[in-house]
């Protein structure tokens, strides 16, 4: 082989040896934490430099014309919309995954809300376990939860949507909720083993319930599509409580995570300034 033929090969070898850039996360905000109209909330998110937003049940009464208007507004603000709720009325309606008697209502509710997700071009939908049921053993409810997730996953697969299951703390915010930690959430992911069922890791809820956040993140990372962010106590801005978010973000970076990091806290001051600071701090920690 002559020298001029060898040089391109050497160049390609050298390039493959270079460190690859770290996967990029997408910043988002849960809209219920902001004040004002839906349009006001989108503008707040855009002004703070966020890339996307997460909805809860705002869309429940929207017409097709409303949906097109919202999509146009989000595009004009350069905002994505990443998640809605598959069961926005889970506290009010009998749609718990831990009760087999409610399975039909659950599946109908999920299918209905995934229709909104498709129209809004949103790739994920939040799925709640529901509250524990009096008179049924933990094992019975767990088996129902696993089966419910699988059935919901099949509905989601037909719609081309990923469902993300969220554990919530029962110590402070959601007494009686069944799936109360991401440790249990990881066990659920392994047992369900469905490509359309993944985990939402709310760092605030996990800190309140069990602590040991970084180790649990490391174990659960392959299943996580979204992280929710808030400090403890108070569920306020990162940096106002006991949690070292710089270390948490660095741990997430080491896992080559490339999903969403969503601010779900109650801003103590001006929301634009607060969210700007929070996202800048997250980016700085993950680029260090």
Roles of regions detected by a PLM:
Residues 2-15, 20-26, 30, 34-49, ...:
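Histidine-acidic metal/acid-base catalytic patches
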Residues 33-35, 59, 87-90, 131-133, ...:
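Active-site-proximal loop/turn and secondary-structure-junction residues that shape catalytic pockets
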């Amino acid at each position: 082989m002559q020298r001029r033929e060898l040089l391109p090969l050497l160049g390609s070898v050298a390039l493959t040896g270079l460190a690859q850039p770290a996967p990029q996360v997408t910043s988002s905000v849960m809209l219920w934490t902001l004040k004002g109209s839906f349009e006001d909330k989108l503008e707040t998110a855009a002004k703070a430099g966020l890339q996307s937003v997460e909805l809860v049940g705002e869309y429940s009464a929207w017409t097709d014309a409303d949906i097109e208007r919202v999509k146009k507004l989000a595009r004009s603000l350069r905002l994505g919309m990443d998640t809605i709720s598959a069961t926005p009325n889970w506290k009010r309606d009998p749609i718990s995954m831990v009760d087999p008697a409610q399975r039909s209502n659950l599946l109908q509710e999920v299918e209905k809300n995934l229709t909104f997700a498709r129209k809004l071009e949103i790739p994920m939908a939040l799925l709640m376990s529901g509250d524990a049921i009096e008179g049924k053993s933990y094992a019975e409810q767990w088996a129902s939860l696993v089966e419910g997730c699988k059935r919901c996953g099949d509905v989601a697969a037909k719609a081309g949507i990923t469902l993300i299951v969220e554990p919530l703390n029962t110590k402070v915010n959601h007494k009686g909720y069944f799936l109360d930690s991401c440790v249990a959430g990881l066990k659920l992911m392994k047992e369900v083993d469905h490509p359309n069922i993944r985990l939402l890791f709310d760092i605030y809820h996990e800190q309140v319930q069990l602590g040991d956040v970084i180790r649990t993140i490391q174990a659960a990372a392959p299943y996580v599509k979204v992280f929710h962010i808030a400090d403890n106590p108070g569920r306020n801005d990162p940096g106002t409580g006991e949690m070292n978010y710089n270390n948490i973000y660095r741990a997430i970076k080491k896992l080559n995570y490339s999903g969403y990091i969503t601010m779900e806290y109650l801003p103590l001051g001006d929301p634009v300034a607060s969210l700007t600071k929070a996202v800048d701090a997250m980016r700085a920690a993950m680029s260090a």
